[in-house]
Amino acid sequence: MAQVINTNSLSLLTQNNLNKSQSSLSSAIERLSSGLRINSAKDDAAGQAIANRFTSNIKGLTQASRNANDGISIAQTTEGALNEINNNLQRVRELSVQATNGTNSDSDLKSIQDEIQQRLEEIDRVSNQTQFNGVKVLSQDNQMKIQVGANDGETITIDLQKIDVKSLGLDGFNVNGPKEATVGDLKSSFKNVTGYDTYAAGADKYRVDINSGAVVTDAVAPDKVYVNAANGQLTTDDAENNTAVDLFKTTKSAAGTAEAKAIAGAIKGGKEGDTFDYKGVTFTIDTKTGDDGNGKVSTTINGEKVTLTVADIAIGAADVNAATLQSSKNVYTSVVNGQFTFDDKTKSESAKLSDLEANNAVKGESKITVNGAEYTANATGDKITLAGKTMFIDKTASGVSTLINEDAAAAKKSTANPLASIDSALSKVDAVRSSLGAIQNRFDSAITNLGNTVTNLNSARSRIEDADYATEVSNMSKAQILQQAGTSVLAQANQVPQNVLSLLR
């Protein structure tokens, strides 16, 4: 090896090795002080890129876990509000069951409806005011996406539905609305109600007064209806003519009638005080005028004495063919029982509803007048109309009954099948609550999975970028020793050119 002064190759070699050990020592100290194996891309370019992607995933998944917890909070808030809505619906159902009981008075129903209305208004208030972080969760249909992953599209959707009185089908829910008026309602709810029912017996039509029961013909100028005394048929005649008995007439008979000759013959052949029978009647000879047949006979009818006078038979006449007969009273045969009567007519009884029914009369519609207005009722009396519109009975604020038509009643009439309506509303609330409960369980599962993923990613990133202290301490010790050795050797290498000077002495 040449002895030179200008170039100290040993020193240069030693310096180079010393720089290497210095770099190794610097790297080891940096890793030990930071705890990271990769402090910059130069430490491990590929590893740094991989670790950075892991960091992005870890941070994204950690935030996603917080998002999922927010999703649980939203679901819990919504479900809590729905629970209160459910409680109100249950109370409304309880009140509706009470309202359907027929023992309730009008004031009872009003009190029940007042509480139902308050409960329904509370449902709307809960719907409008329940919110999470400024978002109203029940006031409208909405789909809320919760980011539960570190990448696009990794979401879980919470289906929020509008839940209020209208969406539950309970808008206008009423258990104390107007009810269809009946004839019975009109009679019991109003004063001075008048009118009539119509009946038809064949081609004949009749009216029956709803208050007095009087029967008249169904006409513009109605006639009173009677029951015929002879045959029980309906008639407008108030009496039936009885049959006059020829034997008893106050007008003198024609000469030689059978009755006159028979009575004259009895007088002629008898004496005063004798009795005889004729046509089922027993007569007594009161007066005998001569022996020609003239005279008077009497009998008792219905407790009254009736005298028959025979006259106009000539004195010494050979027969009684010229006899005439005259009664002190007119006597008739009753058309009802065939008995003798002094009445020329038998009075017919006024017809009643039972008489119409006995004649197979069929009931038709009715005309009912309330407060000056005439209403029409159907044959069964359970439907009242005016100008073709069904009438309902309603109550004013002071509790006074009033009649309104179907148009006015539509907005306030009682809900048909109220219990079924509430059950439907409860089912809808239950369905939404079930959905929210399921989504909470899903979020719990997502949070658990995110936690596992973050743990595994942290472990993977640690293996790439975290410093292995055992290795790095060993590297630092090695570098320190090399530094010490290099420094010492460099000092000796720097002394080598001094040896060349010895050649110059």
Swiss-Prot record:
Annotated localization: Secreted; Bacterial flagellum
Role, per record: Flagellin is the subunit protein which polymerizes to form the filaments of bacterial flagella.
Designated gene of the protein: fliC
Keyword terms: Bacterial flagellum, Secreted
Gene3D superfamilies: 6.10.280.190, f41 fragment of flagellin, C-terminal domain, f41 fragment of flagellin, middle domain, f41 fragment of flagellin, N-terminal domain, Flagellar export chaperone, C-terminal domain
Gene Ontology, cellular component aspect: bacterial-type flagellum; extracellular region
Protein name per its UniProtKB record: Phase 1 flagellin
Other noteworthy facts: Individual Salmonella serotypes usually alternate between the production of 2 antigenic forms of flagella, termed phase 1 and phase 2, each specified by separate structural genes.
Family according to the record: Belongs to the bacterial flagellin family.
Lineage of producing organism: Bacteria, Pseudomonadati, Pseudomonadota, Gammaproteobacteria, Enterobacterales
GO molecular function terms attached to this record: structural molecule activity
Main location: secreted
